[in-house]
Amino acid sequence: MKLYSYNKCGTCRKAIQFLENKKVKFELIDITETPPTKQILKAAMKVKGMKKLFNTSGVQYRELKIKDKLQTMTENQAVDLLASNGRLVKRPIAVDKNKITVGFDIEEYK
């Protein structure tokens, strides 16, 4: 399993703690240095939808006024933007074989 995470994110720390407690092996990837690939983002978008992939509480989301742009943004434009800036991506993202989970929900992680 790959876990795209940010070390200053409380939700990410909860996900890491949960996985460690369950003895799940995972590769930790700093989402700010290595954002998810376009392929992963497209797959996540099919599960969650475009708007749910954005970290709406992030500073850069507000600075870039993404909320205003989402109305006219295509899925490809969103994927390009998210793949270029990991701080815009909702986290953590867990990628395991055929499943992608965005955010941390204990029920989804079980």
Predicted regions and their residues:
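Thiol/selenol-based redox catalytic cores and closely related redox-interacting motifs
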Residues: 31-110
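Local sequence-structure signature of Cys/Sec-based thiol-disulfide redox active-site neighborhoods
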Residues: 1-22, 26-31
